[in-house]
Amino acid sequence: MALEKSLVLLPLLVLILLVLGWVQPSLGKESRAKKFQRQHVDSDSSPSSSSTYCNQMMRRRNMTQGRCKPVNTFVHEPLVDVQNVCFQEKVTCKNGQGNCYKSNSSMRITDCRLTNGSRYPNCAYRTSPKERHIIVACEGSPYVPVHFDASVEDST
């Protein structure tokens, strides 16, 4: 009797373990939309000419762990305004994909570029505040930015 119960419960246990193994890795994984927000949206501050802004933000936003991310752009606009770019002018992405959008108006941004000779773990960045149109790749439901593609000057 005990053996029969074990044989019935064994497949159920195997099924539960398979489901947990499949679901668990995605539980702690950051979504592409959340990663975009972490890496590119800084609504709480305005563009800073402080030479330490990029050094601090790149560390704070975990972009200097294991390597120095060479280039990054922070957008200093409300998150909803950045998300709304997904419904503005459709443009072709740098990689040829068709899911990029250009902001209708220029936005306040800060470009961070790794300085020449800077090596991990001592990542040092040059800070450049600007006002430019942003181009982002969007996907998902809701349709939101998942990749910062470029910034461009006003063409007027």
UniProtKB/Swiss-Prot annotation:
Pancreas and other tissues and body fluids (indicating it may have other physiological functions besides its role in digestion). Its EC number is 4.6.1.18. Keywords: Disulfide bond, Endonuclease, Glycoprotein, Hydrolase, Lyase, Nuclease, Secreted, Signal. CDD domains: RNase_A_canonical. Residues 33-43 have a biased composition (Basic and acidic residues). Residues 33-53 are annotated as: Disordered. It is an enzyme of class 4 (lyase). The active site is at residues 40, 147. It is found in: Secreted. It catalyses: an [RNA] containing cytidine + H2O = an [RNA]-3'-cytidine-3'-phosphate + a 5'-hydroxy-ribonucleotide-3'-[RNA]; an [RNA] containing uridine + H2O = an [RNA]-3'-uridine-3'-phosphate + a 5'-hydroxy-ribonucleotide-3'-[RNA]. Substrate binds at residues 35, 38, 69-73, 94, 113. Disulfide bonds join 54-112, 68-123, 86-138, 93-100. PANTHER family: RIBONUCLEASE (PTHR11437), RIBONUCLEASE PANCREATIC (PTHR11437:SF24). Endonuclease that catalyzes the cleavage of RNA on the 3' side of pyrimidine nucleotides. Acts on single-stranded and double-stranded RNA. This is Ribonuclease pancreatic. It comes from Pan troglodytes.
